[in-house]
């Protein structure tokens, strides 16, 4: 049975610091979809996925996201 993979989303702030947005289990279908997408919507905000890191020690996929600029 597939329990998915824990994914941690980090936002890169303008100052260069990282802020954790969330941590949740993704299905393997969602993880596989990362091969085909550049943008992720979470909490009603759109981000560009710029890097990913597989943390084997903790069994987690860590994604670095940059917020998209919105004109308003």
What are these regions, as identified by a protein language model?
Residues 2, 68-72:
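Glycine- and charge-enriched low-complexity intrinsically disordered segments
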């Amino acid at each position: 049975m597939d329990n998915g993979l824990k994914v941690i989303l980090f936002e890169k702030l303008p100052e260069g610091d990282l802020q954790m947005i969330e941590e949740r289990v993704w299905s393997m279908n969602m993880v596989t979809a990362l091969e085909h997408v550049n943008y992720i919507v979470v909490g009603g905000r759109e981000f560009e996925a710029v890097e990913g890191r597989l943390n084997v020690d903790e069994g987690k996929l860590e994604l670095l996201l940059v917020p998209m600029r919105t004109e308003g």
